[in-house]
């Protein structure tokens, strides 16, 4: 059995973070994919693409430990209607601003989000779902260490510590 429904896959840019200038940036919103996802999915049909990568947006769905998966549900409903398999990226550069990046809570809170998301999505899938816990761990670590993705406390110049924290979060069960 193939893991993916189609060889070719689409990806909708879902980076979601606070810029170094302190401005929230959701690429899902900036590209209007957050409101055009059904149209975007239908546009894939002539190309025989039935697999897409989407981002959950940890910063957007996390309400201090409870979650608003409204957007996730809407995209899943549209994906089902259009025969699309979604592979979810859970953290795409961004995380809640009120979270100390280097604390153990970062790891446990991310694990809680992952578990809650998997439980929420379970009824939507007939086949095993595909998840990417943290998008591009090396690039994310570099971006934090260079100050592109600000953290509290600052992670500038601490690329090894940053990467270790991201790996701890991604592998926590």
Question: Where are the language model's segments positioned?
Answer:
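Glycine-rich, proline-tolerant flexible connector loops at the mouths of alpha/beta enzymes
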Residues: 56-67
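Active-site region of glycoside hydrolase catalytic domains
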Residues: 2-9, 77, 81-173
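Catalytic domains of carbohydrate-active enzymes, especially glycoside hydrolases
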Residues: 30-57, 78
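Glycan-recognition patch characteristic of GH18 chitinases/ENGases
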Residues: 9-11, 17, 30-32, 51, ...
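Active-site-proximal loop/turn and secondary-structure-junction residues that shape catalytic pockets
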Residues: 14-16, 58-60, 92-94, 137-138
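N-terminal small/glycine-rich loop or linker at the start of catalytic domains
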Residues: 1-29
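Short glycine-enriched, charge-decorated loop/helix-capping segments at active-site entrances
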Residues: 24-30, 100-105
């Amino acid at each position: 059995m193939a893991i993916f429904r189609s060889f070719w896959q689409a990806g909708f840019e879902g980076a979601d973070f606070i810029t170094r200038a302190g401005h929230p940036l959701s690429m899902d919103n900036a590209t209007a994919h957050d409101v055009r996802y059904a149209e975007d999915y239908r546009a894939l049909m002539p190309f025989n693409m039935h697999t897409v990568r989407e981002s959950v947006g940890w910063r957007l769905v996390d309400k201090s430990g409870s979650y608003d998966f409204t957007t996730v549900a809407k995209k899943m409903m549209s994906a089902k209607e259009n025969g699309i398999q979604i592979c979810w990226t859970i953290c795409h550069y961004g995380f809640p601003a009120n979270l100390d990046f280097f604390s153990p809570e970062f790891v446990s809170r991310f694990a809680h989000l992952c578990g809650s998301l998997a439980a929420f999505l379970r009824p939507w899938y007939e086949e095993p779902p595909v998840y990417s816990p943290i998008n591009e761990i090396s690039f994310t670590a570099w971006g934090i260490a260079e100050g592109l993705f600000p953290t509290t406390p600052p992670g500038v110049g601490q690329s090894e510590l940053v990467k270790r924290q991201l790996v701890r979060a991604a592998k926590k069960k």
